[in-house]
Amino acid sequence: MLCAAGGTDRTGGIIHFYSASGRAAAGDLTRNIIGIILACIFGGLSVLHIYWAAGGRLGKAAAVPTAGGEPAFEPTTSTTLLVAAGLAAAMLIIFGGLGLFGEVVAPVTFAWLTLAIALLFLMRAIGDFGLVGFFKQPSDSKFAYWDTRLYSPLCLAVTLLAFVFLYLRP
């Protein structure tokens, strides 16, 4: 809520918003934007996994690590849907952290769950020192190519955004 007395302060070409408590509301805006970005990432990834579970093929060949030229595992429809559900849950946790569910669940619960998400994605970015992550063994597979250029950096970005989201928590 903006302060009724003054509301905004224009200094150096930058508008600063202050809440009634005097705290800059710009941090709240930044947190909301970060939350929306995280929710979109999780929602998009969830939809992609649902697409794969429904039989979609686009990008699927690059989604599973390979060992010796063969897929390291064969994801089943149920495990793919489980991953989609986990990503959808992460999206809902971020929405909860933004206050979209009111006071139904204590805000600290969403903070702890967001921390768990951040740590999970950090572990994924680091990897298993074998097939996935920044510290994987060198490979010329399609998965390794995309893991180095997209998957692991995205996991690290999600981690950093989640930590900033937590840091800016009111």
What are these regions (language model features)?
Residues 40, 55, 67-98, 115-119, ...:
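Core segments of alpha-helical transmembrane spans in multipass integral membrane proteins
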Residues 48-83, 100-102, 135-142:
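Interfacial loop at the N-terminal end of multi-pass membrane proteins
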Residues 35-51:
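N-terminal signal-anchor transmembrane alpha helix
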Residues 9, 16-18:
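Intrinsic-disorder-associated, low-complexity terminal segments enriched in Asp/Asn/His/Tyr and depleted
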Residues 126-138:
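Transmembrane alpha-helical segments of integral membrane proteins
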Residues 81, 110-116, 141-158:
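Individual transmembrane alpha-helices with interfacial aromatic-anchor signatures
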Residues 164-170:
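Juxtamembrane boundary at the C-terminal end of a transmembrane helix
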